[in-house]
């Protein structure tokens, strides 16, 4: 096996300048300074001269690169590692990795045919780098820090061997929060310093009033990723949750637009290394999903036709709730912003205004194809200077509003007309070449221009191609990747193992626990008799979680019969639907088992047909457990994991004490329950009262508006649903407390 690139790196230190690292690329020495021969000229050209600004160097380089090389740089898609870390998704399709000489890269081509994002054929890694000149890929695997650094170094070495050197920008979804690893959402858990879910981070910030939680979180991400050579994150979600049935609630910071904006005021400079764009020691962020994905029509996900619309049913909701965090992204110069798949619905929306006080034209195009929002609002009015990175799959399956265009036209329309700079979910240079060729080959002399479109907007042009590539090159120059793309695997392992970072993350886990109810039950005492059981979406998962829970309870007497227990300790982890899988009805938020619910038709309206929903296996047993414990004066202590805003009534009614967490470690929850850590967390979103406040009528209209956060929904709900305090939406417990945003008890 050949020597890994990591073992062959040579470094040249400039006095008062960047380190130059290379394996084989020529290094130019001039006037006591070192320069890398990026463009292959062998001179200190504008491209090679690190003393010029990143923008100046990028502008010079687009004049050197060939058209084919530039087309390869407007696409990004998932990429795989070598045989040591095979992709489970690709393995299910029969793909068998073939190692390169280093053992790190996969040289076997692959056909992706079962993806919701669309089908595509992907070449070997060498062909992707050398022939296609693709320079943006998305990494989903979860290697060790050392292996990650080795893999990234090997990719960078391949890019060095091309005539024109452009380093590889390897992107990843977030890797520093706990939770089930979900394709396309978070790409690792437990490898890097691991915080609770983003909702839990928000709960901790609210409860402690300490925004420095975000500062430390961001700094940890920056140091860990940078040490590994991972320089770009598809993170974080600036979306404000306004419909609780949105599956992606679990990746947000909740429903408080002011807090979300404040979080991004700290998150972006902390990760990128400053507020003036990414630094060589920083990691670029892609803030998503402009102009806010929370305004879901009855929670439907835009990966599917029923969820293709953003509905703004209340006047001014776009500006008031959904835009604020993106202002922070622009203030602090986030390197890129990702528009959402969905498109605005004028027919079902109230008037919305732009930043000049003028009505916004809610043209029915997906936001990546929507010039009004991207070029008009985001760039011209809000002043965004970075690049636009589309969400995954907009050219294939999620092409809402432009489905009448063919794929080359969608590429041209996104890049040339609306201003997208990087198209995600596609590595297909042939489609890009076709879109470019149509600008000059007379294609539309023999083919009809689709109605409502102009032919010049449907093709890639030199102007739009240069603009897009110049923006992504500028980011790479800012990151210092042209000069020093290689990471030190040993240092990567040391940085990720920093004890203080893991301890800080563990503390935030404890701070994320929210105490909702306590009839003098908590904290529990040592030595009490405890019946402990965990409940999940499957019997297998519940059994494994119960075993792990009982092993954590060393200070109590465990009993197997609830009737013999002083305390029943129930850890409840519901799950509704599955990400990237459409549900036959509305996303179920009741904690239930075999519940009969309505189906929906293709337009999202309820039908007379029904199906069964289970969000918690064993939910129907919980009242019996509680009854057995209560029969002799015992108490029930329950904890609910809340990646979604569950309807918690069925659990609260039988519980004497109730806590919630947000992908919070069970050990942290037990610290609160047993008094080892006093509860401080506050709810980052409102928990709905029940099905009645999420009811959808025959026309598909929800009784609580889809575009308004839970804390503000009461103003728009029928008076007949409101109680003596004028409240209708939030759950109210036996003690009279409303489980609204910002609620949380202490002992």
Q: Where are these predicted regions, by residue range?
A:
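C-terminal non-catalytic regions of proteins with extracellular/luminal or membrane-system context
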Residues: 1-32, 38, 92-122, 208, ...
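Hydrophobic faces of well-ordered beta-strands that scaffold small-molecule active sites
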Residues: 75-77, 135-139, 168-174, 232-235, ...
């Amino acid at each position: 096996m050949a020597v890994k690139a990591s073992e062959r790196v040579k470094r040249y230190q400039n006095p008062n300048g960047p380190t130059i690292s290379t394996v084989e690329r020529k290094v130019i020495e001039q006037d006591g300074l070192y320069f890398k021969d990026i463009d292959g000229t062998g001179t200190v050209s504008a491209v090679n001269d690190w003393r010029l600004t990143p923008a100046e160097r990028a502008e010079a380089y687009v004049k050197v690169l060939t058209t084919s090389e530039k087309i390869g740089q407007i696409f990004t898609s998932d990429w795989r590692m070598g045989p040591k870390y095979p992709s489970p998704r690709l393995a299910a399709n029969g793909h068998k990795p073939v190692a390169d000489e280093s053992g790190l890269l996969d040289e076997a081509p692959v056909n992706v045919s079962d993806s919701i994002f669309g089908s595509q054929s992907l070449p070997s890694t060498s062909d992707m780098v050398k022939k296609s000149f693709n320079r943006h890929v998305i990494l989903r695997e979860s290697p060790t820090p050392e292996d990650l650094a080795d893999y990234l170094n090997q990719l960078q070495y391949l890019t060095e061997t091309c005539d024109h050197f452009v380093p590889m920008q390897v992107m990843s979804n977030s890797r520093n929060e706990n939770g089930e690893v979900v394709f396309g959402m978070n790409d690792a858990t437990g490898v890097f310093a691991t915080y609770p879910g983003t909702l839990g981070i928000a709960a901790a910030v609210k409860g402690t009033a300490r925004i420095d939680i975000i500062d430390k979180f961001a700094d940890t991400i920056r140091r860990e990723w940078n040490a590994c050579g991972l320089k770009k994150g598809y993170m974080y979600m600036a979306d404000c949750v306004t419909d609780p049935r949105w599956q992606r609630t679990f990746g947000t910071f909740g429903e408080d637009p002011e807090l979300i904006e404040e979080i991004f005021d700290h998150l972006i400079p902390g990760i990128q290394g400053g507020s003036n764009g990414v630094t060589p020691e920083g990691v670029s962020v892609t803030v998503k999903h402009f102009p806010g994905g929370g305004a879901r029509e009855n929670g439907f996900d835009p990966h599917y036709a029923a969820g293709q619309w953003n509905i703004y049913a209340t006047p001014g909701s776009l500006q008031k709730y959904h835009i604020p965090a993106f202002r922070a992204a622009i203030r602090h110069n986030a390197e890129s912003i990702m528009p959402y798949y969905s498109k605005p619905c004028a027919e079902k929306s109230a008037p919305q205004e732009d930043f000049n006080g003028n009505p916004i034209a809610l043209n029915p195009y997906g936001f990546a194809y929507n010039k009004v929002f991207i070029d008009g609002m985001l760039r011209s009015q809000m002043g965004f200077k970075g690049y636009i990175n589309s969400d995954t799959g907009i050219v294939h399956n999620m092409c809402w509003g432009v489905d009448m265009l063919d794929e080359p036209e969608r590429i041209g329309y996104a890049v040339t007309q609306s201003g997208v700079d990087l198209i995600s979910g596609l590595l297909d240079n042939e489609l890009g070449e076709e879109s470019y060729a149509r600008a000059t080959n007379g294609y539309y002399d023999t083919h009809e221009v689709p109605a409502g479109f102009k032919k010049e907007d449907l093709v890639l042009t030199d102007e739009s191609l240069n603009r897009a590539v110049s923006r992504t090159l500028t980011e790479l120059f800012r990151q210092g990747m042209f000069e020093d793309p290689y990471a030190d695997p040993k240092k990567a392992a040391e940085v990720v193992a920093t004890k203080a970072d893991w301890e800080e993350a563990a503390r935030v886990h404890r701070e994320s626990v929210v105490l909702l109810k306590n009839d003098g039950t908590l904290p529990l005492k040592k030595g009490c008799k405890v019946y402990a059981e965990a409940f999940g979406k499957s019997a297998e998962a519940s059994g494994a979680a119960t075993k792990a829970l009982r092993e954590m309870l060393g200070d109590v007497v465990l009993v197997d019969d609830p009737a013999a227990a002083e305390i029943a300790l129930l850890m409840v982890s519901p799950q509704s639907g599955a990400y990237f899988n459409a549900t036959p009805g509305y996303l179920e938020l009741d904690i239930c088992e075999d519940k009969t619910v309505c189906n929906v038709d293709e337009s999202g309206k309820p039908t007379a047909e029904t199906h069964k929903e289970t969000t918690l296996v064993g939910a129907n047993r919980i009242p019996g457990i509680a009854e057995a414990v209560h029969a002799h004066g015992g108490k029930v202590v329950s904890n609910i994991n809340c990646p979604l805003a569950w309807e918690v009534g069925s659990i609260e009614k039988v519980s004497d004490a109730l806590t919630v967490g947000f992908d919070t470690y069970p050990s942290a929850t037990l610290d609160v329950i047993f008094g080892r850590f006093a509860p401080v967390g506050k709810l980052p979103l409102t928990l709905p009262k029940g099905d009645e406040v999420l009811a959808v009528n025959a026309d598909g209209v929800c009784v609580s508006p889809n575009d308004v956060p839970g804390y503000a929904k009461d103003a728009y709900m029928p008076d007949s649903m409101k109680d003596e305090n004028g409240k209708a939406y939030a759950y109210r417990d036996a003690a009279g407390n409303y489980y609204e945003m910002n609620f949380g008890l202490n002992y």
